[in-house]
Amino acid sequence: MLTITPNFAQERALRLLRSEWKSHRTFMISSPTGSGKTALAAFITHGCNSRNMRVMFVVPYTILIEQTAARFIDYGIPMEDIGFVWRDHPNYDPTRLIQIASADTLIRREFPDNIDLLFIDEAHLRRKKLLEVIRDNEFKVIGLSGTPFSPFLGTYYERLIKPTTMKELIERGDLSPYEFYAPTKPDLSAVKSTSSAEYGSDYKEAEIAAIMSGADLVGDVVDNWLANGQNLPTICFCVTVSHANFVTVAFNWAGVNAEIITADTPHEERQLIIHRFEQGGTKIIVNVGTLVAGFDSDVRC
């Protein structure tokens, strides 16, 4: 028995899914941060498990594996129903009704043949082998994303479910209103792009990092934060590690306590940085692709 009840966005999503369930096999649920996509997945998973159906929930980042399991358990799903597909996790058990899987681990193994429903979290991230799994099987698939704007998604997901919008969540008070400040616009016209079957097209990292690390642009970022950031807890996203180091040093020179987290930052050190951030000792965490999901600290800028 779950310990939570659906909020307004989850009620809408469940109603829309029920009305389309028999007509389509694959669904994309487009819903912003703060709307409760993980809880929505828990409601659907609980319903499937009550009919002895097996569910797999695939996440793109390792930080989301234990976090998703913890959320499911908090919502009332029994811990003994959850197995893990992640490296050599001690709770690997393919017989359990719920499998929480790392995308990187899953695509390197033979896909299980007993799954009835597959969730793809952060489904806008292109993983070629996962897309092949969606295409080549007959089980139901639900993609979850706050930004499902990539054109390739329409090839694999038949039906779009959009239960709410960021505007509605802000008007209800579920999300904070926001302001944009962009004092300097970098010239990216000469930056080349690169593409791959796995991740699609994007700017070349080295070229865009050189522009984003320009002294004028970084200086404007620091000056703008000092003028408008109001000393609020802040997350800064950078292109490369060298870019992040440059930005961190610039904030430190300005007297702002900023720290850096990258993919190579050990887990224990990362937790200490986050703890200092939550306690107010660190004002800014500068990161490179590490705090893009599953970061629950209070951030105001």
Task: Identify the meaning behind each predicted range.
Residues 160-238:
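Conserved interdomain linker/interface between the two RecA-like ATPase lobes of SF2 helicase motors
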Residues 66, 81-94, 235, 244-252, ...:
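Conserved helicase ATPase core of P-loop NTP-dependent helicases/translocases
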Residues 122-181:
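Post-DEXD/H (motif II) to motif III coupling segment of the RecA-like Helicase ATP-binding lobe
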Residues 114-117, 283-288, 293-301:
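A short beta-strand element within the Helicase C-terminal
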Residues 38-43, 47-74, 241-242:
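Conserved Walker A/P-loop ATP-binding site and its immediately adjacent core
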Residues 23-45, 237, 261:
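Walker A/P-loop
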Residues 1-30:
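Conserved pre-motif I regulatory segment
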Residues 73-111:
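Inter-Walker segment of RecA-like/P-loop motor cores
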